[in-house]
C-alpha cells in the first residue's frame, strides 16, 4: 500500500511541476506579447512582439497539452489586454502553433523543432489571414495580414 502511495505522490508532484511551468510560460508569453517589445504594426490592431518565442520554448519543453494551454492562455490574455477583438482567434492559433514541436528528447534544438518554427509561421500567418478576412474582408486582409506576419 505504501508503494502505491509513493508512486501516486511522485505522479502528483510531476503534475504540479508541469502545471506550474505552464503557468509561468503563459505569464511570460503575456508579458512578452503585451508589454515587452510591443510595436504596433498595420491598421487592424496587429503588433510585433516576442511572445511567440515563449510559446515556441513552451512547445519544445512541455508536453503538448501543457504547451497548448500555455500558448492559448498567454496569447489570449495579451490580446484581452491590448486588442480584445483578436482574443478568440489568438487562442485557437496559439494552440495550433504548438502542434509541430516536440518535447520528447533532452535536446532543445533538434531538426524537428527547427522545421517546426517554419510550420508554426505558416500556421500563424494562415490563421490570422483567415481571422482578419472574416473581420475586415479577405481582399484587405491579404495585404495587411500577410505583410504583418512576414514582419513578425
In which residue ranges do the predicted regions lie?
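Loop-helix junctions at membrane interfaces
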Residues: 1-152
